[in-house]
Amino acid sequence: MPVAEFPGSRNWGYDGVYPFAVEQSYGGVAALHRLVRACHDIGLAVVLDVVYNHLGPEGNYLRDFGPYFTDRYRTPWGDALNFDGPDSDHIRRYFIENALYWIDDCGIDALRLDAVHAIYDKSAYPFLQELADSVHDRAAELGRNVYLIAECDLNDWRVVRSASSGGLGIDAQWSDEFHHCVHSLLTGETSGYYADFGSISQLATAFQEGWVYRGQYSPVRRMRFGNSPDGIQG
């Protein structure tokens, strides 16, 4: 879960407003350092959830200090961050430095990138590709293995393809459709996006292939959805 500072003392962390500040009710950055060291001492890697698609609505003062947000796009949770508009170079660098901060200063081993489908960016050098390049370069400098894991509901193989093969270079991708298959089978729920799932064969496909919808028709979306992940290691 994300640890960025948020209003109050209890929260899932997805409306954090100070990306570099560890939530004080968790013990701040000193407590995070202790947790990471304790995990490493017993051979556990630490994966941190980070949110680079929006900031929370309460206590968010970044807008007062620069063009961090854009009105060209809108996320389900509020204003989108400015990754491809005027003065966006500085905003991109701010969030890349945030990723490097968790890796360098806190010893984090992997970052789970929240809802990258809500990172809107039409630039020729996508922010996510620049982020992946920067993180992998830093990992090489440190002689460490550091991974990026994207949450993405687009079923798009380009997220995890290497940049040399036309992708973004993210190391792995969250498999939401595996979850949806398991949930629908165990609960029988058919509302919302669960209406697209419910069979054992779909669960097998999600497990073996990464996701279910690879270009075929999705009843919920009423369109063909996704592309084939053939050739990508599961």
Show where each model-derived region lies.
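Substrate-binding/active-site clefts of carbohydrate-active enzymes
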Residues: 1-110, 115-141, 158-159
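Conserved alpha/beta catalytic core and glycan-binding cleft of carbohydrate-active enzymes
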Residues: 128, 132-234
